[in-house]
């Protein structure tokens, strides 16, 4: 792998809040050594996009890895000089004086293999053919992502993270870290996540994938060669997903049964505000996301089940962990309900592992983990204060 320089944020040419990490620049890490995948195949000569915030201390003990969810990326915080509107997806959590304080911690965001934001994925050129991988890109798993992230840590000379943190799918990666590399993280922070998908969640993913696969513009996953994108399928997939990210309470408050116009029109066009919102979200998503990536990531979600190798016994699976845990859930999250977080907490307690648990009564459903709720952020701030005290940050 090429040498890694620890980047510093570029000077801002525009006004930013004092608690912003500022203008940031991603870096591309190239790995020549093949990465063995869980499916038995391997991928060589791959790239991972990485962003960092804060300063790695001399002991390299203050690093925190932030793992991203389905449609996010390495761009966790800050803005890009070429597009100051492109704010990091967890910017309210990461920055100077924020819960994950970059004055004390060195924060790393990694874009996972198979994504469409610069890391090697279906849109990348397959060296064997000179054309985009497309449908030929190998199916990847949460464990594969974690193994690749461990190589990023090696490149920075980080032998142990102060914490590995993630929400939703990112939380699954944090759990996988605690199992695959138990000695390489002091703390595991799991937010709005689950130890495995329920049958209902797998079903949602299947319906979303079916929308993409049945789009005439999908072309078996090789739509790049045809100069098209399966936008209709991707739009429907996003609409389905977005419904599951919001609570009934939140949707009622935002939209209720408000009409888009003054009166009903007795048509099958958009009549209600909630329909307009979902179509807008679907159209926006279809413009920037890749359909093959959506298929890969939702399948990785489906496959994650650390208890499977232990006959379905999560307590036995979690016996491998050494980290201290913070697990947080949200009362109105029906995608990954609090009961799923409590399963994880029980398995940890059964193993006498140190774990703190909080269930936050927020009205915003699954997406609450991305929002600036004072109770949620105070919880995270207090926990990171504890970590900082432990490591002398």
Curated annotation (Swiss-Prot):
GO terms for cellular component: cytoplasm. Pathway: Amino-acid biosynthesis; L-methionine biosynthesis via de novo pathway; O-succinyl-L-homoserine from L-homoserine: step 1/1. The active site is at 168 (nucleophile), 333, 366. Its main location: cytoplasm. It catalyses: L-homoserine + succinyl-CoA = O-succinyl-L-homoserine + CoA. One of its GO terms (biological process) is homoserine metabolic process. InterPro entries: AB_hydrolase_1, AB_hydrolase_fold, HAT_MetX-like. NCBIfam families: homoserO_Ac_trn, PRK00175.1. Belongs to the AB hydrolase superfamily. MetX family. PANTHER family: HOMOSERINE O-ACETYLTRANSFERASE. Homodimer. This is Homoserine O-succinyltransferase. It comes from Cupriavidus necator (strain ATCC 17699 / DSM 428 / KCTC 22496 / NCIMB 10442 / H16 / Stanier 337) (Ralstonia eutropha).
